[in-house]
């Protein structure tokens, strides 16, 4: 687990300079008993395991994704950081959905996802089959040809149990457009 080692100075910067409040941990059950990286410094760890890509449509996954977006609606959560084990698949999926909901262009959200290529898992790109399947299913099941990916993600999150007021709070917390 050397790839996730936080230096003492890095921890100090996160706590003292960035005033980090929350660690959102997407890793699975094998990491359930591990303490949060900065728990001793008062940073709350919230662990909700996620699955990536086209696995996001199961009832269990939708409940978990809904829980994350409900958390994003809480101002007290911020500033926060989120992570999985490698920083590519689960993190990439959650951040893609978040950015898309917030109105980031598809081109920019996909480009940001492609930056997960720098993780320990290697090349990730827009034609990576699981990612492409996720986008295809979002549009097939939650949008129409005339609608955007943003609309499809919004509808997906409503199906995940996230209320309209919570989605509005996510926007208010993370953009200057509210």
Question: At which residue positions do the language-model features occur?
Answer:
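Ser/Thr-glycine-rich phosphate-binding loops at phosphate-binding pockets of nucleotides
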Residues: 86, 90-91
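Cys-dependent protein tyrosine phosphatase-like superfamily
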Residues: 1-81, 93-178
């Amino acid at each position: 687990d050397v790839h996730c080692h936080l230096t003492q100075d890095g921890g100090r910067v996160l706590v003292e300079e960035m005033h980090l409040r929350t660690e959102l941990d997407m890793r699975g059950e094998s990491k359930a008993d591990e303490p949060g990286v900065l728990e001793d410094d008062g940073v709350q760890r919230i662990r909700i395991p996620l699955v990536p890509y086209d696995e996001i449509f199961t009832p269990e996954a939708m409940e978990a994704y809904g829980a994350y977006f409900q958390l994003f609606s809480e101002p007290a959560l911020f500033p926060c950081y989120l992570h999985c084990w490698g920083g590519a698949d689960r993190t990439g999926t959650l951040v893609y959905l978040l950015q898309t909901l917030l109105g980031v262009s598809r081109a920019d959200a996909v480009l940001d996802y492609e930056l997960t290529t720098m993780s320990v898992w290697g090349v990730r790109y827009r034609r990576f089959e699981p990612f492409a399947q996720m986008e295809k299913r979002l549009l097939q099941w939650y949008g129409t040809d005339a609608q955007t990916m943003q609309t499809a993600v919004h509808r997906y999150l409503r199906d995940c149990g996230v209320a309209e007021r919570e989605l509005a709070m996510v926007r208010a917390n993370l953009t200057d457009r509210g």
